[in-house]
From Swiss-Prot:
It comes from Paramecium tetraurelia. Belongs to the TMP family. It is found in: Trichocyst. This is Trichocyst matrix protein T4-C. Structural protein that crystallize inside the trichocyst matrix. It comes from the Eukaryota. One of its GO terms (cellular component) is trichocyst.
Length: 27
């Protein structure tokens, strides 16, 4: 459903933000 798709998009954005934070921590 639409709600599920939105949740997936939010999860993808969250994972991308987490990845950016991890990269920043490494620097």
């Amino acid at each position: 459903g639409a709600v599920g798709e939105i949740q997936i998009l939010l999860n993808n954005i969250a994972s991308q933000l987490n990845g950016d934070q991890k990269k920043a921590d490494k620097v």
